[in-house]
Amino acid sequence: MQWQDQAIILGVKRHGETSVIAEVMTRGRGRHLGLVRSGRSRAMRPVLQPGNAVEVVWRARLDEHLGEFRVEPVTLRAARLMDTATAVYGVQAMGALLRLLPERDPHPHLFDALEVILDHLHNPADAGELFVRFELAVLNDLGFGLDLAECAATGARSDLAYVSPKSGRAVSRSAGAPWADKMLLLPPFLGVEGNHAADVDSLAAAFRLTGFFLHRHVYEPRGIEAVAARDGFVQAALKALNPASQTLSSPNGVSA
């Protein structure tokens, strides 16, 4: 068995004295593990850093085997991903999100989105908005997609201001007004019009929105917690936009 694909390094684990088991996100074959011989060598260590884009060739006798990777560098961005808190936490948080998906399950759109985000992690405003959209895409691929295109009550596609915590569907300002204190806010930049830039308040609301549904549909049923890197990324992104911003929590205790 053999195949070749584009990949992004998510992490490595030591295996024996000189080798590592690399975890990568491939474009056509999803999240995949493989042994990299001499992966701890001086030549390979810089290549196998999280966030780097590589080309991998995977070989194994049978498809269900771990197999071995041959890895060639394409874009070595890991060094600059260590420059900002949003980048450091963002790489870790996105890796954790991808681990919620089944191994070897292809999600090419998530691979493409991951590459875009990695190239924008130095800009907190762009990185925050892209990260929220990445979380929405992961929720959708897990079967818990939100419907933000029209009002659940009236079918209206304008002035959407809330999201129902029960249905995950958008609600217009007028229809949701009587229950506004029980609704989640829908940030304008996530609306169908899509012509609003994310500011610190709308970004905080967006993090709270995705955090709520990840907790409800994924973390709580699986008995796991969101990785600390998500909170680190959220706070770094908000602080970069507004140094006076504080940690925000939803009423149920889920961090923004």
UniProtKB/Swiss-Prot annotation:
Keyword list, A-Z: DNA damage, DNA recombination, DNA repair
Gene Ontology terms describing biological process: DNA recombination; double-strand break repair
Entry GO terms, CC: bacterial nucleoid
Keyword DNA damage: yes
Organism superkingdom: Bacteria
Protein family according to the UniProt entry: Belongs to the RecO family.
PANTHER family found in the cross-reference section: DNA REPAIR PROTEIN RECO (PTHR33991:SF1)
Function in brief: Involved in DNA repair and RecF pathway recombination.
NCBIfam families xrefs: reco
The protein's name: DNA repair protein RecO
Lineage: Bacteria, Pseudomonadati, Pseudomonadota, Alphaproteobacteria, Hyphomicrobiales
Gene name of the record: recO
